[in-house]
Amino acid sequence: TDVKESEFIAEGAVGR
């Protein structure tokens, strides 16, 4: 789990 991946997953889950 990287910071970039975490951000991407978080944005994806919260976004669409």
From Swiss-Prot:
Biological processes per GO annotation: adaptive immune response; blood coagulation; innate immune response
GO CC terms in record: extracellular region
PTM description: Conversion of fibrinogen to fibrin is triggered by thrombin, which cleaves fibrinopeptides A and B from alpha and beta chains, and thus exposes the N-terminal polymerization sites responsible for the formation of the soft clot. The soft clot is converted into the hard clot by factor XIIIA which catalyzes the epsilon-(gamma-glutamyl)lysine cross-linking between gamma chains (stronger) and between alpha chains (weaker) of different monomers.
Claim: Disulfide bond is one of the keywords in the record: yes
Localization (cell): Secreted
Keywords per UniProt: Adaptive immunity, Blood coagulation, Coiled coil, Disulfide bond, Hemostasis, Immunity, Innate immunity, Secreted
UniProt remark on domains: A long coiled coil structure formed by 3 polypeptide chains connects the central nodule to the C-terminal domains (distal nodules). The long C-terminal ends of the alpha chains fold back, contributing a fourth strand to the coiled coil structure.
Assembly and oligomerization: Heterohexamer; disulfide linked. Contains 2 sets of 3 non-identical chains (alpha, beta and gamma). The 2 heterotrimers are in head to head conformation with the N-termini in a small central domain.
Function: Cleaved by the protease thrombin to yield monomers which, together with fibrinogen beta (FGB) and fibrinogen gamma (FGG), polymerize to form an insoluble fibrin matrix. Fibrin has a major function in hemostasis as one of the primary components of blood clots. In addition, functions during the early stages of wound repair to stabilize the lesion and guide cell migration during re-epithelialization. Was originally thought to be essential for platelet aggregation, based on in vitro studies using anticoagulated blood.
The protein, known as: Fibrinogen alpha chain
Naturally occurring in which organism (per UniProt): Meles meles (Eurasian badger)
Higher taxonomy: Eukaryota, Metazoa, Chordata, Craniata, Vertebrata
Gene behind this protein: FGA
